Amino acid sequence: MTRFDASEPAERRKLYADGIQAHRERGDGFVTFEVDADSVSAAEDLDPELGTPWVQFADGTINVDCTDEELESLKGLLSEFPVFKIDEIHRSEEVEGVNVRISAKADPNRIGQFVDAVFARVYGLPEEFRVWVVDL
């Protein structure tokens, strides 16, 4: 893997698929995709106090943090990706929002499509947002 960011939709989906494949070849840890700070400031519905949106993938599981409102959007999105299922929802007493773990038993390209849809539709990012691979 030689590139670590992308901003065009097709490039982002390829970045996710390549990152997931590289993660699988390494066989340990997780891969984290994080939205660029400039893209966060361009998003109208994101609360900057909640931090930068990110999505992690490891061992067939997607991990995201979201608000209750974003969780409802995520559930709606999952209806379009029937192979993906919520495994666990964790609510912390110390922090607002929820952590969601989603079973993602699919090929890297399909997972990449889902990850891009999470950023665009759950977090409400504009079409041309930049995402980085920040941990592999």
What residues fall within each predicted segment?
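Haloarchaeal acidic low-complexity proteome signature biased toward cell-envelope/secretome components but also
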Residues: 1-58, 85, 94-101, 109-136
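Helix N-cap motif at beta-to-alpha junctions
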Residues: 67-68, 104-109
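Mature extracytoplasmic domains of secretory-pathway proteins
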Residues: 56-86
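Residue-level "edge-of-site" marker
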Residues: 90-92
